[in-house]
């Protein structure tokens, strides 16, 4: 079955770093291949935790790219190694998934544009959220501040993945080119 089950989400960008998260369906360690060339011919691979199996997770991959240049456009693709884990040191990579889609982002900096959008109280109301995302994609801000209350309650990781990485909207890659900065609200802290 499919290992990667969401588009990437850019998170918490800065002049010299960018976070990228995506959802998985089984034990894996995710990675990002990034570079300044659109075809990634200059690509560098960065794993969750920096190593192949140290940041194994069955739900969400979070990769932090560091040492980036300010005000620079980078191209990237996500991937994940499927990991079999017995116990202790009984673990091995048993497969790989790397979608072909290449996305891009621009780091913050003096030469980068500096406008943003704010959304809040989205509460998993998908029809309204889809309209908001459509407008955000039309405007094309340098970032979006998601100012809390993504839902009514987030009681488990499955709900969190749906609220943030897999919203029920047609623009499944809504955050693959525009970074989001989260500010949790009172509803995000319940459960």
Regions found by a protein language model. Give the residues of each.
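Acidic, histidine-bearing metal-coordination/catalytic regions of metal-dependent phosphoesterases
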Residues: 1-118, 123, 134-140
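Active-site neighborhood of divalent metal-dependent phosphoester/pyrophosphate hydrolases
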Residues: 111-132, 137-191
């Amino acid at each position: 079955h499919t290992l990667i089950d969401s588009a990437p989400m850019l998170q918490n960008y800065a002049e010299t770093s960018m976070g990228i998260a995506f959802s998985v369906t089984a034990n894996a360690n995710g990675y990002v291949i990034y570079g300044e060339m659109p075809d990634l011919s200059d690509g560098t691979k960065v794993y969750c935790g920096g190593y192949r199996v140290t940041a194994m997770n069955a739900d969400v991959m979070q990769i932090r790219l560091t040492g980036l240049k300010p005000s620079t456009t980078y191209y990237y693709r996500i991937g994940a190694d499927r990991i079999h884990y017995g116990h202790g040191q009984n673990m091995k990579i048993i497969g790989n998934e790397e979608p072909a889609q290449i996305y891009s982002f621009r780091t913050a900096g003096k030469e980068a544009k500096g406008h943003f959008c704010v959304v809040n109280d989205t509460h998993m109301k998908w029809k309204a959220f889809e309209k908001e995302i459509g407008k955000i994609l039309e405007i094309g801000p340098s970032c979006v501040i998601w100012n809390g209350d993504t839902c009514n309650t987030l009681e488990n990781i499955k709900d969190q993945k749906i609220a943030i990485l897999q919203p029920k909207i047609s623009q499944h890659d809504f955050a693959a080119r525009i970074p989001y900065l989260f500010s949790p609200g009172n509803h995000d802290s319940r459960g």
